[in-house]
C-alpha cells in the first residue's frame, strides 16, 4: 500500500502551494488582464473580496444602521425608567411590570364602623332628568297604524 501513487498529484499539489490563496501566477498589465473574480494588484492578480457587491451593499448598510438605532432606543428607554425612579439602590428589571398608583384616594377607602351607613337614596347615583314628563310615552309597536288604544283580549281573526 505504501507504493501506491496517484498520477498527476505532484504537479497539482505543487501548483496549489505556489499559487497561494490570494495570488495567482497570472501577470497583469496593459496587455494581460486578470481572470473573472480577480483584480489587478500591482504586478499580479488578487482575488476580489467584496462581500456584498452593488445595491445589496446599500441595503445591508441601511438595515444595520436602522437595527443599531432600534437597539440604542431600547437601551435609552430602559435607562430612562431608571432615571425617573427615586430609589437608585434597588435593582430594576427593564422587562418587569410597572406598579401603577391606585385611583381611589386613601381618605375614601377608610370607613368608620361606629357610624351608621348613609341612606339608600344617597348611595345610588341618580341622573338629572330635568322636569318630570306630564304626558305618557307613545305606545311601542312594530305596526303603529293598527294601534287603536287599549285592546283587551285576543286579537286573532281565527277566534
From Swiss-Prot:
**UniProt keyword annotation of Lyase present:** no
Disordered: annotated segments: 122-159
Recorded superkingdom: Eukaryota
Q: Where in the cell is it found?
A: Membrane
Question: What is the recorded membrane topology of this protein?
Answer: Single-pass type I membrane protein
Identify the species of origin: Homo sapiens
Under which name does UniProt file this protein? Transmembrane protein 92
Q: Membrane-spanning regions, if any?
A: 58-78
Please tell me where this protein is predominantly located: membrane
Q: Which residues lie on this side of the membrane: Cytoplasmic?
A: 79-159
Secretion signal, residue range per the UniProt entry: 1-26
